[in-house]
Regions:
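Catalytic cores of carbohydrate-active enzymes across secretory and cytosolic contexts
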Residues: 1-220
């Protein structure tokens, strides 16, 4: 994943200053970028990599037999892999999470509690692991129609655009029949737009539709 991604970026002519790796699956991106560099330049390259760990579950932390990796990588790649990706619990294993943490300047977990768990799980990196709670960017996540409706009732919400936390005041409108009706109308209009994008699926906006979209992984 990481190697192919880096080659694709190069083939497309992109010049990227900062690479953000989500999970260790993509950690080989650093190897691809570093394999032709001097030792000093390899260390400098770490400044351009950030890593986000999303889960403590084993499926999110790839481990491969060192012998198997040696068979598919050239000498320069494998030497870097051994240096930065050694598994602290098994000398015969390459650990892609360790590779990511050893080669990225910035490392973070996705919640305060997850940060605590990750620091315990990877104690050798304890002092470097920060926590950034997952969330949404309010002004791009809320549709234009709903945003306009919220603006209309902002006298109750209290300035939601400047302080999104004020959206909790929407509970003050739960018994407002006009607001509830307008919110439902906005929701239906958004649903029609979505159905038009998915017209080949023949989804009807007036039919209740349940969707399930997750990655294909055993623990999901």
């Amino acid at each position: 994943l990481g190697i192919g991604g880096m080659k694709a970026l190069e083939a497309l002519g992109y010049s990227i200053d900062m690479f953000h790796l989500n999970e260790g699956h993509a950690a080989l991106a650093f190897i691809e970028k570093a394999k032709k560099l001097s030792a000093a330049d390899v260390n400098s390259l770490k400044e351009h990599f950030a890593y986000t760990c999303h889960t403590p579950v084993a499926a999110g932390h790839d481990r491969f037999q060192k012998k198997a990796m040696q068979e598919i990588m050239n000498e320069a790649e494998f030497n870097l892999l051994k240096k930065f990706g050694a598994d602290p619990d098994n000398s015969d294993v390459i650990n892609l999470t360790q590779l990511a943490m050893n080669t990225c300047k910035f490392v973070n977990a996705v919640a305060k509690k997850h940060g605590e768990v990750t620091r315990a799980q990877f104690s050798q990196h304890r002092d470097r692991i920060q926590s950034i709670t997952n969330g949404v960017h309010t002004h791009t996540w809320i549709s234009d129609l709903v945003a306009a409706l919220l603006d209309k009732y902002d006298h109750t919400l209290g300035g939601w655009r400047k302080d999104p936390k004020r959206l909790k005041n929407i509970l003050l409108l739960k018994d407002n029949a006009s607001f509830r009706s307008e919110l439902w109308t906005a929701h239906q209009e958004n649903k029609k737009k979505l159905c038009s994008l998915l017209k080949s699926w023949r989804i009807q906006p007036d039919v209740f539709t349940v969707c399930w979209a997750r990655r294909i992984a055993a623990y999901k």
